[in-house]
C-alpha cells in the first residue's frame, strides 16, 4: 500500500491486493483514493484516486484513475483475465462485470461508461464514451464495442461480435446476437425495442 489513501469502516483489502494512491493526475486534484463501508478487494490492483464503497466486491481487477464501484456491484475477474475499469467509469446497483476464461475475455470500462441496476457485462466487452447499461440487460462478448451515446436497458441481450455506436438505444426484450463468424454493426441514431431481434447488420434505412 503506497501513497495517501483512506481505508476505513469494514472495508477489506485481501490476498496480495496492491493499493497505489496518486493524486494530481485527474481534474479532481485533491481527491484521494478511498475504500470504505463494506467494500472488499481481492487479488486486485487499485490505483490513483479510485473510490470503492458500499458492499462492492472486487476480485482480480485493475481499477484506476477516478473510477467508482459501489452499492452491491460485483467485479469478478479470474486467474486468466482481470476486469479493467478506468477513467471516470462507474459500476453500481447490483450490476455485475465478469471476465471470461477464454483468451482476451477482459471486460473494459473506460471514459464515462456506467453499468448499473441489475445489468451484466461478461467477457470481451469494451464500453467507452457515454455508455449506460442498466435494467436487467446482458452484454456478453464478443468482442463487443459500445461507444458514443449508447443506452442498453430493460431485458435486452447483446451477444457475439458486435459494434454499436452513436446514439443507439436498445430496450425491452430486444436481442442483438451475432452467430459464429458474423459481425453486426449498428450505428445510430436508432431505437431498438420491444421484441426486436437482430442477427445481422441491418440494411441502411431498414431500422
Located regions from the model:
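Residues at the loop-to-beta-strand transition
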Residues: 5, 11, 17, 23, ...
Amino acid at each position: 500500500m503506497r501513497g495517501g489513501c483512506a481505508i476505513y469502516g469494514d472495508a477489506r483489502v485481501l490476498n496480495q491486493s496492491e493499493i497505489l494512491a496518486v493524486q494530481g493526475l485527474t481534474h479532481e486534484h485533491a481527491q484521494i483514493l478511498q475504500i470504505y463501508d463494506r467494500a472488499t478487494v481481492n487479488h486486485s490492483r487499485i490505483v490513483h484516486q479510485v473510490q470503492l464503497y458500499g458492499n462492492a466486491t472486487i476480485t482480480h481487477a485493475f481499477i484506476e484513475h477516478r473510477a467508482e464501484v459501489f452499492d452491491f456491484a460485483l467485479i469478478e475477474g479470474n486467474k486468466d483475465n482481470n476486469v479493467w475499469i478506468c477513467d471516470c467509469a462507474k459500476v453500481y446497483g447490483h450490476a455485475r462485470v465478469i471476465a471470461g476464461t477464454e483468451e482476451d475475455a477482459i471486460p473494459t470500462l473506460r471514459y464515462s461508461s456506467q453499468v448499473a441496476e441489475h445489468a451484466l457485462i461478461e467477457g470481451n466487452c469494451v464500453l467507452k464514451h457515454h455508455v449506460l447499461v442498466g435494467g436487467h440487460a446482458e452484454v456478453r462478448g464478443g468482442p463487443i464495442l459500445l461507444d458514443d451515446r449508447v443506452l442498453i436497458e430493460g431485458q435486452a441481450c447483446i451477444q457475439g461480435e458486435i459494434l454499436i455506436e452513436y446514439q443507439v438505444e436498445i430496450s425491452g426484450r430486444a436481442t442483438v446476437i451475432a452467430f459464429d463468424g458474423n459481425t453486426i454493426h449498428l450505428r445510430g441514431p436508432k431505437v431498438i425495442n420491444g421484441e426486436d431481434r437482430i442477427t445481422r447488420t441491418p440494411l441502411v434505412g431498414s431500422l
